[in-house]
């Protein structure tokens, strides 16, 4: 009886220890966003809340960003192993030695847009010559502006860039301290509300520049040494985006719960516009998150021609689709 009791106690102790211990070691990932959290980031917060990253062995920390250019630089430097950035920025900076690799595309369409006041007399990109464009210093739009300028027949240096905080864009535009600003389409509704009928707008994709937008990028060295971790991250992220397309409300709720200053209705509108940016024939027919070879080759040539590359490279080294589940596709 005594032996049986001891064995029972030992078994109970072992079971308790196993229950208290993690199933496997968690890989800490500091994932830098392209910007401050918003509706476009809802899937990451939802997957984290649901424990999907944790179940995949990832201890995820979501770090607010300060622009795509900054995100690329930090990932390339290894300060963050994984991040989110505009793909055209990643291609441009790769030519300067920034070793990052795209592994999951979010914006199949360029999210970039230009905003101005109609009352200013501006009607198109060409009218921006000699004008002031305000946005944050690290904003990705500045990096790829030369391509848009050349595509519209104006000198890229004919505009003056004014450093302003992202939250000051509308106020600066209304005060006419700047003539135009840049912003992503997923907050288009905010500009419409604030500027009303005086809002002037052109989407870059409709002005000759539809490069791939926000894409999950990975530090090249980290990818080589941690393929299983990257594969797990992409698998969860792809699953999360598909889940949010199917049912956005709980995803946006998870975002708002983690970022108390955000308002649910506003971020839900944000997400609805994100869905538009995610949708193209490749995300619908090949896989959600895919980077098409021909489009990537075209984006590379555009960057090379209009912006310039310090060091040319094989564009296929800048991205991979190997971690995607091709059974998961964009449904809208």
What is each residue range found by the language model?
Residues 12-13, 23:
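Cleavable N-terminal signal peptides
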